[in-house]
């Protein structure tokens, strides 16, 4: 066999070669974790799964953009997700903010991708997603053809790194003139029922296939992850998302790019890629199970303290501590986050210490820090 530079240079390159002996144990583990997570959600009643879904979708939207170097406003994303899910009535209106048009469009795209998992994927739908990513027709300062395939007018589509004079080409996508046929083949395969191919494996192959085609000027990574989410929703048998694959990809981004590049420069065996994909999916599910338990613990905390008096600042900060609070809680940080004085912040904190909600951290350093007490989360 004559070795080619990229996987798509081989004839019949999408006749994917996989080693089931390596993959089936990983598939079994992922399926077990999926079952645990969905079973856990079914046991939580009505509101807690909604909160878990809100958290997971918010995380997915933020992280799929962060992978591309774009930082979205979390509160705007969360508010947009709540409105699209129709659960904004469960939250204090003062905590919901108005999202930008761009954020609203991205949220809608991600939700539609999973919500319609039982419907065939179409090229028109992918075009609509692309337009949602770039509603102004610009990517940063550059005008792009939103909702249209790339035409390679300015040269071949390449994935590169490094600055001027030291550019490294990691990958070159198929030529633009091949895209209509290649995408038609991909979409036909994506929609075809294949009883012998587990849907978690199909999600991994779809991810590799679409990102290898790189059919647009920009946004290919986010579209790839939306397409992956759709197949994962089908594998779950549920449009409700409770875990974030993008968050786990971001956490191992260097490994992701490394295995992707080696696969795209290899032969047609994609076993190593699928091993990485399934392991990463398993990690995403495990993290979701941990977050879900945190959600349960938070609900139990508020139930135990249903007759305890807290002021609005304390309620806000306790919820932050149960959620995505980063770093150590200090009087200074409390004052800054609640927009109050240091004296008021200290009174708020001391009151929570007296009520057994907070304890002083053992290793506080130069300034005293606090954390939830052990019996607050048990």
Feature-to-residue mapping (PLM):
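FIC/Doc superfamily catalytic core
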Residues: 1-378
């Amino acid at each position: 066999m004559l070795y080619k530079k990229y996987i798509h240079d081989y004839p019949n390159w999408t006749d994917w070669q996989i080693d089931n002996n390596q993959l089936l144990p990983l598939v079994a583990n992922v399926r077990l974790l999926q079952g645990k997570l969905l079973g856990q959600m079914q046991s939580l009643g009505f509101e807690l799964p909604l909160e878990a879904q809100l958290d997971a979708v918010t995380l997915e939207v933020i992280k799929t953009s962060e992978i591309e170097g774009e930082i979205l406003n979390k509160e705007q994303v969360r508010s947009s997700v709540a409105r699209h899910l129709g659960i904004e009535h469960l939250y204090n209106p003062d905590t919901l903010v108005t999202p930008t048009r761009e954020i609203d469009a991205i949220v809608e795209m991600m939700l539609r991708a999973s919500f319609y998992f039982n419907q065939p994927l179409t090229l028109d739908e992918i075009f609509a997603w692309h337009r949602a990513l770039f509603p102004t027709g610009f990517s940063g300062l550059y005008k792009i053809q939103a909702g249209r395939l790339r035409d390679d007018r300015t040269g071949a589509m390449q994935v590169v790194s490094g600055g001027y004079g030291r550019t490294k080409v990691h990958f070159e996508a198929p030529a633009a003139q091949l895209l209509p046929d290649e995408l038609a083949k991909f979409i036909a395969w994506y929609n075809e029922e294949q009883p012998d191919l587990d849907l978690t494996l199909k999600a991994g192959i779809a991810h590799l296939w679409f990102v290898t085609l790189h059919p647009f000027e920009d946004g290919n990574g986010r579209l790839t992850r939306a397409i992956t989410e759709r197949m994962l929703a089908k594998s779950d048998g549920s449009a409700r998302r409770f875990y974030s694959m993008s968050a786990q990809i971001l956490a191992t981004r260097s490994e992701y790019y490394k295995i992707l590049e080696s696969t795209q420069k290899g032969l047609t065996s994609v076993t190593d890629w699928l091993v990485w994909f399934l392991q990463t999916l398993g990690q995403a599910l495990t993290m979701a199970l941990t977050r879900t338990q945190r959600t349960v613990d938070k609900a139990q905390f508020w139930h135990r303290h249903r007759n305890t008096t807290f002021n609005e600042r304390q309620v806000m900060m306790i919820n932050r501590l149960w959620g995505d609070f980063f770093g150590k809680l200090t009087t200074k940080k409390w004052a800054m986050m609640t927009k109050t004085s240091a004296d008021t912040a200290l009174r708020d904190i001391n009151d929570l210490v007296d009520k057994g909600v907070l304890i002083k951290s053992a290793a506080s350093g130069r300034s005293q820090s606090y954390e939830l007490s052990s019996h607050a989360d048990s």
